[in-house]
């Protein structure tokens, strides 16, 4: 269990990250009929360029319904103010019908929908090239970087690994996505390890439909099992993170190494979970620099 000082640090960091008001997008595109099947677009700010990289953002929140893309909109705007075109992806979370909880006494909302959460990420990624060309004409799709925070980091890694999904998967693509790379921020990158650690109150098992389905579905959902991807990947992790402990990132990097792939792992001392998406924090600038290194 984290000590009192760690809990206090986490609370202060969360308060700072969520103190920024939501930033309205320039445009919103619907990739499906459900209200959550939308992508917010932020046009690049600052000096006009003929073309700029595209950053696709997946928000976190343990795949739970109360936490949507609005909480990461200040981060999306931060990217736009640094000259990137940004696509912030919403996706279905939680459930409208009961789903088994990790513990009978938990008060947390149920996490994720199987298969809808993954359906949505795949559909958004498949539709983005045409939508971006129409709505963000200055965005250079050849310089696309995926990023995501926490549960969104898991989705970013998964979206980049669809070409190594098991054959027969409805989400599998025959060729890799045209990406410069992925920068995953405190990601739930190894679902099995995260489940062992009880990260986010059982959310990992709930995402895949509960304990009975977990092991079988990991083969189609766990980035640590979808390796190597052949796509440049960087994980940025706060060493003091008590929400998604560094052990999860370490486990993913080890799995990549065993698969013959090198994953960049940037460990930030005295940083917890939320500064990575807090425009007021130095850690956020580090995260954006990692994105820039791949994109430019």
Residue ranges and their predicted role:
Residues 126-197:
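Primarily recognizes the serine-hydrolase "nucleophile elbow" in alpha/beta-hydrolase
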Residues 66-76, 87-142, 279:
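Catalytic nucleophile-loop/oxyanion-hole region of alpha/beta-hydrolase
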Residues 16-18, 24, 192-225:
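Mobile cap/lid helix-loop segments that gate and shape the active-site cleft of serine hydrolases
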Residues 45-51, 55-78:
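Short, surface-exposed "cap/lid" segments of acyl-processing enzymes
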Residues 235-237, 241:
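Short beta-strand/loop motif that positions the catalytic acidic residue
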């Amino acid at each position: 269990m984290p000590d009192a000082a760690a809990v206090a640090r986490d609370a202060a960091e969360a308060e700072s990250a969520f103190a920024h008001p939501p930033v309205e997008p320039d445009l919103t595109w619907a990739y499906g009929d459900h209200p959550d099947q939308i992508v917010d677009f932020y046009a690049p700010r600052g000096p006009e360029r003929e073309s700029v990289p595209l950053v696709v953002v997946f928000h976190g929140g343990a795949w739970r319904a109360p936490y949507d893309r609005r909480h990461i909109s200040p981060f999306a705007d931060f990217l736009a103010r640094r000259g990137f075109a940004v696509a912030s992806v919403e996706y279905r979370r939680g459930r409208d019908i009961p789903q088994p909880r990790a513990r009978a006494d938990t008060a947390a909302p149920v996490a994720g929908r199987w298969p809808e959460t993954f359906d949505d990420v795949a559909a958004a990624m498949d539709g983005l090239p045409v939508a971006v060309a129409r709505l963000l004409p200055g965005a250079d799709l050849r310089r696309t970087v995926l990023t995501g925070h926490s549960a969104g980091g898991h989705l970013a890694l998964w979206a980049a690994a669809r070409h190594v999904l098991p054959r027969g998967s409805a989400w599998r693509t025959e060729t890799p996505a045209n990406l410069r790379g992925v920068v995953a921020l405190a990601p739930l990158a190894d679902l099995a390890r995260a489940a062992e650690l009880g990260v986010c109150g059982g959310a990992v098992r709930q995402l895949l439909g509960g304990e009975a389905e977990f092991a079988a579905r990991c083969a189609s959902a766990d980035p640590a099992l979808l390796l190597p991807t052949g796509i440049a990947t960087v994980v940025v992790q706060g060493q003091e993170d008590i929400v998604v402990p560094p052990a999860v990132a370490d486990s993913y990097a080890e799995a990549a190494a065993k698969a013959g792939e090198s994953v960049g792992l940037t460990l930030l001392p005295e940083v917890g979970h939320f500064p990575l998406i807090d425009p007021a924090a130095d850690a956020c600038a580090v995260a954006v620099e990692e994105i820039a290194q791949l994109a430019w």
